[in-house]
């Protein structure tokens, strides 16, 4: 599945067969995304983006050299993203320390790698995946319709919230399928589309779904709980980079989950990864810096869309 995804992005699938040293940290691990009925709100902001990733590369650098490079106080025991940059993404780009961080990567031929999960996006795409024939399209069309559907739902979160509550999503009763899909279609028709958007195609798919007797991925699930198991992203990395060495920052929940249910491929338990304390491992510390800026970047473009480049340009010219 990962090789198909890689090919869809026009990247050679041989890349994931390589041996790489991959260091990881995470940001925005929300554990769970659900609707809190008593407080009448989601437990976390719906536009939260979970990022898992860090530095790819051989070699290392000692903490004293990093403190000197970033001009940090002697009392600093480990480098964290807040030492390097602060504020929204456009503000972070003005940071001299961020520039030094990027120079360090270039000088050592290190790269930033990451996997991300947009909480709202992953909570709603199961609706489209439940429509007969939807996933049989070419990958580009699948991604296009999912992205458009996400924009529609994100633009009217209060209506989406009401639908989750009304239909106990993602535990929709079979007799409510038509009404649920019709409500989604109504939301889609209200959205202010850009030219070139495939809104008619999206509505057509939802119409098809409204005629189904079941929506397999959004029924018989725990109601009002849209996302659990962020360990799946860890599992995906481990089973994708099967020939590589993965060094991950200690995450107690993930370690416990893996002990209960080891990561395996074709029945073979994988041992290409290890969890470490970030304090003595500067590459994991640098991974915290990497995922932090990636997270800010992804959030920035999610908020500003096509205006992102203009806003960044204006910010840098101030």
Name the predicted role of every residue range:
Residues 1-318:
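Phosphate-ester processing/binding pockets and catalytic centers
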């Amino acid at each position: 599945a990962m090789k198909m995804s890689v090919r869809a992005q026009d990247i050679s699938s041989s890349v994931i067969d390589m041996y790489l040293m991959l260091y990881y940290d995470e940001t925005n691990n929300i554990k769970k995304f659900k609707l809190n009925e008593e407080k009448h709100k989601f437990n976390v902001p719906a536009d939260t983006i979970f990022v898992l990733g860090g530095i790819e590369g051989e070699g290392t650098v000692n903490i004293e050299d990093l403190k000197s490079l970033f001009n940090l106080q002697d009392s600093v025991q480990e480098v964290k993203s807040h030492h390097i940059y602060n504020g929204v993404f456009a503000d972070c780009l003005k940071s001299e320390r961020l520039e030094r961080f990027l120079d360090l990567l270039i000088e050592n031929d290190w790269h930033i790698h990451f996997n991300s999960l947009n909480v709202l996006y992953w909570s709603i795409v199961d609706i489209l995946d439940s429509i007969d024939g939807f996933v049989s399209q070419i990958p580009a069309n699948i991604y296009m319709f999912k992205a458009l559907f996400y924009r529609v739902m994100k633009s009217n979160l209060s209506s989406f919230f009401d639908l989750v509550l009304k239909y106990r999503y993602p535990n929709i009763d079979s007799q409510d399928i038509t009404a649920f899909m019709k409500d989604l279609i109504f939301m889609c028709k209200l959205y202010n589309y850009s030219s070139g958007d495939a809104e008619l195609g999206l509505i057509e798919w939802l119409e098809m779904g409204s005629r189904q007797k079941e929506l397999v991925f959004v029924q018989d699930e725990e109601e009002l709980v849209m996302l659990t198991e962020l360990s799946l992203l860890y599992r995906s990395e481990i089973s994708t980079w099967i020939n590589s060495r993965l060094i991950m920052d200690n995450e107690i929940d993930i370690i416990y989950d893996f002990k209960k249910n080891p990561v395996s491929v074709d029945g073979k338990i994988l041992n290409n990864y290890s969890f470490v304390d970030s304090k003595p491992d500067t590459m994991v510390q640098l991974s915290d810096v990497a995922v932090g800026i990636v997270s800010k970047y992804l959030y920035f473009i999610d908020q500003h869309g096509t205006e992102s480049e203009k806003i960044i340009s204006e910010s840098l010219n101030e």
